[in-house]
């Protein structure tokens, strides 16, 4: 046997590293291993990091600080399946940390994560990749990245996965994504509704809940509602409601149904299948407040469609809603009130709530919960709009007091709704008086000062409805309510400006309030508003005109027109034309100015400080200088007229300037005779008496202070004894005439005589009225001239005097300012040529009165002779 030779052991290759077993207890060491080229090391390191991250948020932060995220992102695309799986699992856990999410967005790993959703990947990878996406999708930027990288389609596919965790994570991610409109539209393209509906059958409540929430969101879109209907989605939802064991899903199921009911076809379908009745019964009989609340919300959403309201009314939804008002849960009360608000568009529902509903809503106005009070007020606002019966019902239920208390609420919506209800109530006079007795004018001031434009608008409208009588306006004025109302005229909001203008127009109904509004600057603000083509409205123009009607001096200066309803009273003055935006100086300031070259200011003032002459007859009938604005109670019978016809013009009617022209009519003959008689009467007086009268008149012209010597001095405008005499004379002589045309003609002749008589057209340039006016200004030491002092007047002097006297005896006439010193009066008269014609009376016609060339002549408006009179 041969000798055994010992085999030599070959040494290991020099380039091979001997195996090294390492046991590490530091996360930092394991993080370093993530850069290893060995797949086994990478897999074990990832597994260790996964276990470490599962232990809590602090560990996730530690891994982030150690720089583990960036090398892990590279492992998502590793060739080794185990490494890739473990890395994906880590990101599923880490992505719940906000700082990690932020870093992942910066590293743009979304494409790599979505790639893990491929069908060929393991279920575990699907689970953690979808978990990562679910965590990431909670933020908007990540949603965009998921959508842009095509993540929606694989997520929808995974809804059919056999693994419940994959379904849950995918559904959660989809729910987050569909909050964005683009994703919802894409969802319809991908036909995602059938797999989502299938998840409603899942044995896991969390999956069912996520599916319902997702359906609730996508059902906001019409196309999605159609797809739900076509896929029998409502049947699934109704089954859930009918299953008591699924009561934890009822709230979300109702939310989906609420959105679906906005679709008319869906509404019809659910009604035909009996689902609507089940829904109402479910809402009324459920003991869970949130279910009742969501049921009421479903009704509210659906009730915005008129056909849906009709169907609800047929199903007697009103009874259900009234029952829900009695719930102990505030959320249910709010939802029921909102549903009633929506159903109010149906007239039948409105009538039903008259007896049942309004009393309960009034009680809710007293709730401690501000939101409940607001919702109840909204329902009452809709119930009482254009419905006097419901407004009465609210008042009978003692609703006025809580509504006025609600005006001081902290919620703007509650204030606006309460103001609306009060406005609706105030449309009826008995209710308006009741509201006024509850101190509405004081309570509305705070809403008028609100910064909310809706509240401002509704408050101004409430003022419009409640300030319809003097007492209410006085209370508003005394409470300081006019100031915030005037400020609202400056609002940039069209609705606020319109309603504030309307309120100002109503408040300007009495002189004191109108004057206070003007003092606060309402007239100036409205003038500025009306200049703007975009800011003005019909109410601002009407309010401006209403205020001007209480300041006729300003109105005539600005507009050059006074209508027959604009009655000239003492204190009126004609300053002449002023441009828009120019401020008209007050009379006192004008009186205290020195004479100048400016146009004379004509003053109307019949008030006097002396008694009338003892020679005047019938002192008891008409007081000296008394203002008469209406002739309705002063008309004499025709018998009296004939009896007194012999003195149409009594003593003092003559003119200091002789009229040498021949009279043009019989009436002028009477005038001439009367003038001659008066002239003779004047000549019989001695020079001393004339001088004495002149001195007295001059003394009376000087502005006086009442109660001189006392500390309280009141300025008075210059008196005008001549004008006082005119008023007395026309009242005695012209007022008794029963024929309106004769009245106008006689008054025209009277005015002409007092202003220098008839003037032939060719002699008009020689009529030296300017010198006369200048002499008066010098004599009175003022630019303000009482109208009675003017003895040589032209068009605008005579037209003003005619209007002032006509207003005293009830002759309706307008005053129109023309160009170059022209002015004229217009009257409305029946055409005499139609007398005796059978049939209805024709419309009266407008005439211009001749006060210059043929005093008393009447010319049809826009006729050639009238145009020659009005225009140069």
Swiss-Prot record:
<feature type="compositionally biased region" description="Basic residues">
    <location>
        <begin position="636"/>
        <end position="646"/>
    </location>
</feature>
<dbReference type="InterPro" id="IPR052441">
    <property type="entry name" value="Armadillo-Ser/Thr_Kinase"/>
</dbReference>
<dbReference type="GO" id="GO:0007286">
    <property type="term" value="P:spermatid development"/>
</dbReference>
<feature type="repeat" description="ARM 4">
    <location>
        <begin position="140"/>
        <end position="179"/>
    </location>
</feature>
<feature type="region of interest" description="Disordered">
    <location>
        <begin position="610"/>
        <end position="693"/>
    </location>
</feature>
<feature type="repeat" description="ARM 7">
    <location>
        <begin position="264"/>
        <end position="304"/>
    </location>
</feature>
<dbReference type="InterPro" id="IPR000225">
    <property type="entry name" value="Armadillo"/>
</dbReference>
<dbReference type="Pfam" id="PF14381">
    <property type="entry name" value="EDR1_CTR1_ARMC3_pept"/>
</dbReference>
<dbReference type="InterPro" id="IPR055445">
    <property type="entry name" value="ARM_ARMC5"/>
</dbReference>
<dbReference type="GO" id="GO:0070062">
    <property type="term" value="C:extracellular exosome"/>
</dbReference>
<comment type="function">
    <text>Essential for male fertility and sperm motility. During spermatogenesis, promotes the autophagic degradation of excessive ribosomes, providing energy resources for mitochondria and thus ensuring sperm flagellar motility.</text>
</comment>
<dbReference type="GO" id="GO:0030317">
    <property type="term" value="P:flagellated sperm motility"/>
</dbReference>
<feature type="compositionally biased region" description="Low complexity">
    <location>
        <begin position="626"/>
        <end position="635"/>
    </location>
</feature>
<feature type="repeat" description="ARM 8">
    <location>
        <begin position="306"/>
        <end position="345"/>
    </location>
</feature>
<keyword id="KW-0564">Palmitate</keyword>
<keyword id="KW-0221">Differentiation</keyword>
<protein>
    <recommendedName>
        <fullName>Armadillo repeat-containing protein 3</fullName>
    </recommendedName>
</protein>
<feature type="compositionally biased region" description="Basic and acidic residues">
    <location>
        <begin position="675"/>
        <end position="693"/>
    </location>
</feature>
<keyword id="KW-0072">Autophagy</keyword>
<comment type="subunit">
    <text>Homodimer. Interacts with PIK3C3, PIK3R4 and BECN1. Interacts (via ARM domains) with ATG14.</text>
</comment>
<feature type="lipid moiety-binding region" description="S-palmitoyl cysteine">
    <location>
        <position position="518"/>
    </location>
</feature>
<feature type="repeat" description="ARM 12">
    <location>
        <begin position="470"/>
        <end position="509"/>
    </location>
</feature>
<dbReference type="InterPro" id="IPR055164">
    <property type="entry name" value="EDR1/CTR1/ARMC3-like_pept-like"/>
</dbReference>
<feature type="repeat" description="ARM 1">
    <location>
        <begin position="15"/>
        <end position="54"/>
    </location>
</feature>
<feature type="repeat" description="ARM 6">
    <location>
        <begin position="222"/>
        <end position="262"/>
    </location>
</feature>
<dbReference type="GO" id="GO:0034517">
    <property type="term" value="P:ribophagy"/>
</dbReference>
<feature type="repeat" description="ARM 2">
    <location>
        <begin position="57"/>
        <end position="96"/>
    </location>
</feature>
<dbReference type="InterPro" id="IPR011989">
    <property type="entry name" value="ARM-like"/>
</dbReference>
<feature type="repeat" description="ARM 10">
    <location>
        <begin position="388"/>
        <end position="427"/>
    </location>
</feature>
<feature type="lipid moiety-binding region" description="S-palmitoyl cysteine">
    <location>
        <position position="507"/>
    </location>
</feature>
<feature type="repeat" description="ARM 9">
    <location>
        <begin position="346"/>
        <end position="385"/>
    </location>
</feature>
<dbReference type="Pfam" id="PF24768">
    <property type="entry name" value="ARM_ARMC5"/>
</dbReference>
<keyword id="KW-0744">Spermatogenesis</keyword>
<feature type="repeat" description="ARM 11">
    <location>
        <begin position="429"/>
        <end position="468"/>
    </location>
</feature>
<feature type="repeat" description="ARM 5">
    <location>
        <begin position="181"/>
        <end position="220"/>
    </location>
</feature>
<keyword id="KW-0449">Lipoprotein</keyword>
<dbReference type="Pfam" id="PF00514">
    <property type="entry name" value="Arm"/>
</dbReference>
<keyword id="KW-0677">Repeat</keyword>
<dbReference type="InterPro" id="IPR016024">
    <property type="entry name" value="ARM-type_fold"/>
</dbReference>
<feature type="repeat" description="ARM 3">
    <location>
        <begin position="98"/>
        <end position="138"/>
    </location>
</feature>
């Amino acid at each position: 046997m041969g000798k055994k030779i010992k085999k030599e052991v070959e040494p290991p290759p020099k380039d091979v590293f001997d195996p090294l077993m390492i046991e590490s207890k530091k996360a930092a060491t394991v993080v370093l291993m993530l850069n290893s080229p060995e797949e086994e090391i990478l897999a074990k390191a990832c597994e260790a990091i996964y276990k470490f991250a599962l232990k809590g948020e602090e560990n996730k932060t530690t891994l982030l600080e150690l720089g583990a995220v960036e090398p892990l992102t590279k492992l998502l695309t590793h060739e080794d399946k185990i490494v890739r799986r473990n890395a994906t699992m880590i990101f599923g856990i880490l992505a719940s940390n906000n700082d990690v999410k932020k870093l992942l967005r910066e590293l743009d790993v979304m494409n790599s994560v979505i790639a893990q959703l491929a069908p060929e990947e393991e279920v575990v990878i699907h689970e953690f990749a979808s978990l990562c996406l679910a965590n990431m999708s909670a933020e908007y930027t990540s949603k965009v990245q998921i959508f842009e990288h095509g993540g929606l389609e694989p997520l929808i596919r995974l809804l059919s996965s056999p693994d419940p965790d994959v379904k849950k994570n995918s559904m959660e991610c989809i729910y987050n994504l569909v909050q964005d409109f683009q994703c919802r539209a894409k969802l319809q393209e991908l036909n995602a509704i059938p797999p989502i509906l299938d998840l409603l059958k899942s044995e896991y409540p969390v999956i069912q809940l996520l599916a319902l929430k997702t359906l609730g969101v996508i059902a906001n879109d019409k196309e999605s509602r159609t797809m739900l209907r076509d896929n029998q989605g409502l049947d699934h939802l109704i089954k859930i409601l009918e299953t008591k064991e699924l009561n934890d899903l009822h709230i979300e199921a109702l939310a989906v149904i609420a959105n679906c009911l906005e679709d008319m076809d869906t509404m019809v379908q659910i009604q035909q299948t009996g689902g609507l009745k089940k829904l109402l019964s479910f809402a009324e009989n459920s003991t869970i407040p949130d279910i009742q609340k969501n049921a009421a919300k479903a009704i509210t959403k659906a009730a915005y469609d008129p056909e849906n309201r009709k169907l609800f009314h047929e199903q007697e939804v009103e009874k259900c809603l009234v029952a829900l008002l009695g719930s102990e849960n505030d959320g249910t009360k709010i939802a029921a009130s909102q549903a009633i608000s929506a159903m109010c568009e149906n007239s039948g529902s409105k009538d039903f709530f008259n007896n049942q509903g309004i009393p309960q809503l009034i009680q809710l106005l007293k709730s401690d919960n501000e939101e409940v009070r607001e919702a109840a007020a909204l329902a009452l606002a809709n119930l009482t709009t254009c419905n006097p019966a419901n407004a009465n019902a609210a008042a009978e239920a003692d609703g006025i007091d809580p509504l006025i208390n609600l005006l001081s609420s902290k919620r703007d919506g509650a204030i606006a709704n309460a103001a609306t209800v009060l406005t609706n109530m105030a449309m009826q006079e008995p209710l308006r008086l009741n509201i006024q007795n509850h101190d509405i004018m004081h309570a509305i001031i705070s809403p008028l000062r609100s910064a909310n434009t809706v509240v401002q608008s509704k408050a101004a409208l409430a003022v419009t409805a409640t300030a319809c009588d003097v007492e209410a306006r006085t209370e508003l004025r005394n409470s300081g309510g006019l100031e915030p109302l005037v400020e609202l005229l400056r609002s940039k909001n069209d609705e606020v400006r319109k309603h504030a203008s309307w309120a100002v127009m109503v408040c300007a109904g009495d002189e004191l309030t109108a004057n206070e509004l003007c003092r606060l600057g309402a007239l100036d603000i409205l003038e500025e508003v009306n200049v703007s083509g975009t800011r003005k409205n019909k109410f601002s123009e009407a309010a401006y005109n209403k205020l001007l009607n209480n300041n006729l001096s300003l109105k005539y200066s600005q507009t050059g027109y006074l209508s027959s309803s604009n009655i000239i009273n003492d204190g009126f003055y004609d300053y002449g034309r002023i441009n828009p935006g120019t401020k008209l100086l007050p009379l006192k300031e004008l009186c205290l100015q020195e004479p100048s070259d400016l146009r004379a200011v004509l003053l109307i003032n019949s008030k006097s400080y002396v008694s009338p002459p003892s020679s005047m007859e019938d002192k008891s009938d008409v007081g000296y200088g008394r203002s008469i604005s209406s002739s309705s109670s002063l008309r004499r019978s025709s018998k009296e007229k004939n009896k007194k016809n012999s003195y149409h013009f009594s003593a003092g009617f003559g003119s200091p300037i002789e009229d040498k022209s021949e009279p043009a009519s019989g009436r002028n003959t009477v005038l001439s005779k009367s003038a001659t008689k008066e002239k003779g009467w004047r000549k019989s007086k001695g020079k001393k008496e004339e001088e004495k009268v002149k001195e007295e008149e001059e003394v009376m012209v000087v502005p006086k202070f009442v109660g001189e010597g006392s500390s309280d001095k009141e300025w008075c405008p210059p008196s005008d004894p001549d004008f006082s005499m005119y008023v007395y004379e026309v009242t005695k002589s012209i007022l008794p005439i029963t024929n309106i045309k004769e009245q106008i003609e006689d008054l025209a002749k009277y005015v002409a005589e007092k202003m220098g008589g008839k003037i032939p057209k060719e002699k008009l340039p020689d009529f030296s009225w300017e010198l006369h006016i200048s002499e008066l200004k010098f004599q009175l030491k003022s630019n303000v001239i009482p109208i009675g002092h003017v003895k040589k007047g032209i068009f605008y002097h005579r037209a003003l005097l005619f209007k002032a006297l006509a207003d005293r005896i009830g002759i309706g006439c307008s005053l129109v300012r023309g160009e170059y010193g022209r002015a004229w009066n217009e009257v409305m008269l029946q055409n005499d040529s139609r007398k005796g014609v059978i049939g209805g009376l024709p419309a009266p016609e407008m005439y211009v009165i001749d006060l210059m060339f043929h005093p008393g002549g009447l010319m049809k408006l826009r006729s050639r002779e009238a145009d020659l009179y009005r225009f140069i």
